[in-house]
Amino acid sequence: QKDLIIKNLDLKKNSVLSQDLEPILETSLNYLDPIKGGYKGSPKFPTFNLYETLLYFYNKTNNKKYLDPVTLLIKQLCSKGIYDHVEGGISRYTVDEDWVIPHFEKMLYDNTQFILLLSKYCKINKDEYFRDKLDQTIQFIKKEFLNKNELLGSAYDADSDGVEGKYYIYNFDEIKDIADIGNYFEIE
């Protein structure tokens, strides 16, 4: 038993808990897209765990180099095509580097991580725009992921009737048929 205790103490010395993570974060920052957010290139996955870590280090150090990438990512996620501006929630990823063209799969896992990061961010940035996206995403999960027994489903498939994104794509005539939207866009 003494050997086991010594072995566990040695493991703790080498664990992530006893290491300085800032050099690792510095390396990670070099891979981030300073203009579009997220990692450079495409496809674009939000990688929430990295951004939660950056937010943690911002709260610990008050160094904006950790907050700025989080702010950029959240702005991109909330304003671009990865976010469903009609029903709320985010898609799994985008196929382009601009966060515009979503892969239409929506996963509970991604949306709960989005909620967690966004709720922590809203404690720092009080802008109602982000709070609205947070609330809309929570409502989306309650409406679309809860079944009649109040159990959560895990994902929405990207395909509808065998076509990726079919559920989300409208043609011109379908848009005209939506109540009052024609007046908004001055469509005749």
Regions found by a protein language model. Give the residues of each.
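Replace the tail clause
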Residues: 1-188
